[in-house]
């Protein structure tokens, strides 16, 4: 039997289960208490911050658990005919609940004709019909729609909020009661990589645990496909020390292992940027690298002035190899020229 994904298993069922978004939850809960519902809502914000989940919870609370909301994925049902079907459905009174609630996810995908059809319904909505629109791209919503719905902006979830939720999931899954390794630094790194999205964080945690029940930084890096940071550090020192031999050997090893050297240089550029940010701020809250790299980064900081020169070289190489059919040769030639300067 297939195992239920953690993101599905731990999807919030109530507002209390949700992480953060306190102001939005307070307003919606107050509307439940006072029964002051709107006919149109627009939930906006980054992916994985709770928009669709909140819409489902809110719909369930409005109808006191009776009936189910009608969910539409606008990404695959974007045409005017799809919306007309919803409009016709909205004209019919609900049979098993007080309100008929429609949740339209990814609503920015709707066609202009679909928006026009929906506009009239929002203007003259039956008293029992409620529409909850969800989107990651509010700038694509017509102004005529925006003026007729109550908007809620969902914020990215903090790294601490995601970490706490991930730790709770690990605890609920029984990892704290066995001999498995739970590295808090690994959980905090997953939270950083998720970039404010709870769903992405839980999905990544699930993927990491599929690789190994021992959660370590090494396993997280392997799961997300990031080159070992040790290799990046070696390359950085090779460039700082103008050691062309070591630099080319690293590229040869990457190439011979079957990895894409163009992708390696792209990821190396991102690594250099994170190093520069650490040099500027000396604070892991501003970078996406794991806290376990503090000693390495502090050592690198002693060569701060040289790092800026290295960054310029890496940016230049990435621009050169972007469309080149033989990036390995171009990388090695550029490296030799740089190291001889």
Regions found by a protein language model. Name each.
Residues 49, 55, 82, 134, ...:
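Extended, largely alpha-helical regulatory/partner-binding modules appended to the mid-to-C-terminal parts
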Residues 1-163, 167-171, 184, 252-253:
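P-loop/Walker A NTP-binding region and its immediately flanking N-terminal helices
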């Amino acid at each position: 039997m297939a195992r239920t994904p953690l993101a599905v298993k731990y999807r919030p069922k109530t507002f209390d289960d949700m992480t953060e978004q306190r102001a939005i939850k307070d307003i919606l809960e107050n509307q439940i208490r006072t029964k002051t519902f709107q006919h149109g809502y627009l939930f906006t914000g980054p992916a994985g911050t709770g928009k669709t989940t909140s819409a489902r919870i809110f719909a369930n609370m409005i109808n006191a658990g009776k009936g189910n909301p009608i969910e539409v994925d606008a990404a695959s049902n974007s045409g005017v005919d799809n919306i007309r079907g919803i409009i016709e459905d909205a004209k019919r009174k609900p049979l098993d609940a007080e309100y008929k609630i429609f949740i339209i996810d990814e609503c920015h995908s709707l066609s202009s004709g679909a928006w026009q059809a929906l506009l009239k319904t929002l203007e003259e909505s039956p008293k029992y019909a409620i529409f909850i629109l969800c989107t990651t791209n509010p700038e694509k919503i017509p102004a005529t729609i925006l003026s007729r719905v109550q908007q809620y902006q969902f914020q990215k979830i903090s790294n601490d909020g995601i970490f706490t939720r991930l730790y709770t999931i690990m605890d609920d899954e029984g990892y704290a009661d066995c001999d498995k390794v739970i590295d808090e630094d690994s959980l905090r790194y997953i939270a950083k990589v998720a970039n404010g999205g709870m769903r992405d964080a839980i999905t990544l945690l699930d993927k990491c645990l599929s690789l190994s029940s021992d959660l370590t930084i090494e396993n997280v890096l392997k799961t997300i496909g990031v080159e070992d940071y040790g290799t990046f550090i070696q390359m950085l020192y090779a460039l700082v020390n103008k050691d062309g031999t070591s630099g080319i050997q690293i590229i040869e090893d990457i190439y011979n292992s079957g990895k894409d050297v163009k992708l390696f240089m792209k990821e190396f550029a991102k690594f250099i940027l994170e190093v520069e940010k650490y040099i500027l701020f000396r604070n892991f809250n501003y970078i996406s690298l794991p806290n376990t790299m503090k000693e390495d980064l502090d050592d690198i900081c002693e060569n701060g002035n040289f790092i800026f020169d290295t960054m310029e070289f890496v940016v230049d190489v990435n621009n050169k190899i972007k469309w080149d059919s033989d990036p390995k040769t171009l990388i090695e030639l550029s490296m030799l020229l740089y190291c001889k300067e």
